[in-house]
Amino acid sequence: MIQRPTFFTPTHLLAMLLATFVLITGCHREAKKNADDGMPVEHLYDKAHTLMKKGNWAGAEVSFKRLIAQYPYGPYTEQAMVENAYAQYKSGKHDDAVSSIDRFIRTYPTHHNIPYLYYLRGLSNSNRDTIFLRKVWSLDLSRRDLSAPQQAYNDFKTVLDRYPNSRYAADAKKQMTELRNMFAQYEMNVTLYYLRRTAWVAAAGRANFLLETYPQSAFQYDAVAALGEAYTHLGNKTLADNARQVLQTNAPDHPWLKGKWPKYPAAIRKLNPFAGEKSAATGQINAVVDSN
């Protein structure tokens, strides 16, 4: 019996071509995915470290994580964990960096890189959520929740207290000073809020708190001026004169002495929740905030 030849319709041919393409693509992806499988740990580390030196933070993070997954223990793994946290920090993934650092500190509490990791955690905490705010709204960072910056301050303090001779101690101290100024600015913001609303007692209380908690901050003389303003309106001439004398001695150019401080924004500007007030002492912008 003679069999008739089989003919493929265009539909059959297209289906076969698609199936072949999917098979080839899948094999290629699998080969690419497993390219690093079985690679010696030192080669994996060199690859990740090279990516990091080139500024390819995302690629470095992927490679470091692959090394850690394949080789959970050992000196290369420990170094990979440290550098992975740095790559996450440089990528702006500050929450991930803090998580990686915390995990390392719990696992290797006596590691020689612990001072560096506390320092890096301070940098990560001080930058949490700030990049987006700066780029989108240019918000005054002293207006936001201060829990992360406060944790950053504690991280830098740990470096200074526990590892005073480490190479990170000097910059940790500098970072602490900058954070203290930000905390002081937050208190100044609230003080200005109360002054503008003629809540003189509350304004004086907040200004005193600033001076007691953050002495020598960049906003100390603004706080003294706020005390002078509040006590003047409260009719306490003695305390108002004391504030005036402090300014005349230490900040004789402060505009409050000439009746030109504080300057409140125009009524239409008050409607803008992101409007700010300039510090007479520093020229910085003090954003207006509602107190808790």
UniProtKB/Swiss-Prot annotation:
It is a lipid-anchor. Part of the outer membrane protein assembly complex, which is involved in assembly and insertion of beta-barrel proteins into the outer membrane. The gene is bamD. The keyword Transmembrane does not apply. Residues 1-26 form the signal peptide. NCBIfam families: OM_YfiO. GO terms for biological process: Gram-negative-bacterium-type cell outer membrane assembly; protein insertion into membrane. It comes from the Bacteria. This is Outer membrane protein assembly factor BamD. HAMAP family: OM_assembly_BamD. It is found in: Cell outer membrane. The lineage of its organism: Bacteria, Pseudomonadati, Pseudomonadota, Gammaproteobacteria, Lysobacterales. It comes from Xylella fastidiosa (strain 9a5c). One of its GO terms (cellular component) is Bam protein complex. The keyword Signal applies. A lipid is attached at C27 (N-palmitoyl cysteine). A lipid is attached at C27 (S-diacylglycerol cysteine). PANTHER family: OUTER MEMBRANE PROTEIN ASSEMBLY FACTOR BAMD (PTHR37423:SF1), SOLUBLE LYTIC MUREIN TRANSGLYCOSYLASE-RELATED (PTHR37423).
